[in-house]
Amino acid sequence: MSQVKKLSTGKIWCFAVGQFGWSVLAALISSWLVNYYQRDLATQQAGQPIFIPQGLAILGVLTILGAITAFGRIFDAITDPLIASLSDRCKSKDGRRIPFMRAAAVPFALSCILTFWSPVNGVSWVNAAFLFLMLMLFYLFMTMYCTPYNALIPELGSTQQTRKIGRAHV
């Protein structure tokens, strides 16, 4: 009978810390994107710059920012199962999950930072196109990191109790 290897507390905490970075990046996008690109009237009157066209610009229903973020979430929904499938079939010496996480970590952070940078100072469709590109890259790299990360949970330990403990620390 083989012995069940117990997952160390250190490994559990390392796994939990792995969520901190992507949680911060996702929180930045979800909390600040609208505030940064869709300024309210008081903020505009205070002199804060505007970078993308404002108002209901898409079929009189959506703002440019609303359309970009909606498309980003649809793109994310499409890439999630694709990345999951690629990760499941990965035959790397580093395992099935880690290569994706390594490849995505730095571009994920950079795409988040560049989402809040505008190539043109002032209102421009170039800024809207750049925002679209950066947000799609953000969601792609988030998927490349988070999907394999979450797939590590069953691989953390060999018992249900160990998996529960690992998930609870996250």
Question: What are these language model-derived features?
Answer:
Residues 2-167:
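Membrane-embedded alpha-helical bundles of multi-pass transporters/translocases
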